[in-house]
């Protein structure tokens, strides 16, 4: 079947939406936003040489070739997928080089300004190669679809894979992204490198983060100050479990200046939703309503009340009933109680 995405026309055996499959020429329709953002950021970063490390159908690398000024290399280990990618490169008359080899080999033999890590499942096996081989001041785009691991749903697996302890609660997706970035940062520090998060999203079944990579002991030492543990019982409200979670990334998830530069209408809704996600955690109205046996009021009304009390209040991408605010949890609870009495 033939798919049109962005400027590319792709021939694929099948189109699929969901966590992913191990099949030749795999095309995931749920990842269109992921690829749109990748195009936008590569254009903003101004990089010259790009590695699409997991070719699949070739759609990402072909779109980068057609929609940016970067030179593109597509790596793919599957012979069947390589044949599909060759066909799609020809269909689009794209200037993309296809290499039939695994990610680690290709990334270690050619210097790249941007490396895209979008594997089936966890990115963990590929992070060291990406961090070590991207050029100084270069960028990584990393996708993780192992959400159950990153959100603490499988505690032992979370410990094994990411060396972290996470409680699977209303904060699971923010904590999942902070766990992922924290792990990337720790791996970077092991090689005297450091990262600066540029953009981070949760979308459906995957997390996607973009980071800038620098080199140097001083930068690495400064970066690790942003990795640590948090206790929701002491930092949010005593109704939460009294445990230390982490290690996680405690600093910004997004580069605010970069977000302001992205004007693509295809991604504008998501960009607007993540603009205030740098603040650590949030207050969730569903959580408060459940604990206080109150009906859930309109989110906008509660945000207005919070701002009338002199605090900031913004939507968050991590929960449809979450508010990023500097208003204490207990005070938001009192605002809900007062609203319920009207």
Swiss-Prot record:
Keyword RNA-binding on entry: yes
Keywords associated with the record: Methyltransferase, RNA-binding, S-adenosyl-L-methionine, Transferase, tRNA processing, tRNA-binding
Annotated residues for binding of S-adenosyl-L-methionine: 35, 60, 76
Gene Ontology BP term (one): tRNA N2-guanine methylation
EC number, as in UniProt: 2.1.1.216
Domain of life assignment: Archaea
Pfam families according to UniProt: TRM
Reactions catalysed: guanosine(26) in tRNA + 2 S-adenosyl-L-methionine = N(2)-dimethylguanosine(26) in tRNA + 2 S-adenosyl-L-homocysteine + 2 H(+)
GO molecular function, one term: tRNA binding
Domain Trm1 methyltransferase: 1-336
InterPro entries linked: SAM-dependent_MTases_sf, Trm1, TRM1_arc_bac, tRNA_met_Trm1_C
Function according to Swiss-Prot or TrEMBL: Dimethylates a single guanine residue at position 26 of a number of tRNAs using S-adenosyl-L-methionine as donor of the methyl groups.
Family indicated by similarity: Belongs to the class I-like SAM-binding methyltransferase superfamily. Trm1 family.
Protein name, per record: tRNA (guanine(26)-N(2))-dimethyltransferase
UniProt source species: Thermoplasma volcanium (strain ATCC 51530 / DSM 4299 / JCM 9571 / NBRC 15438 / GSS1)
Annotated gene: trm1
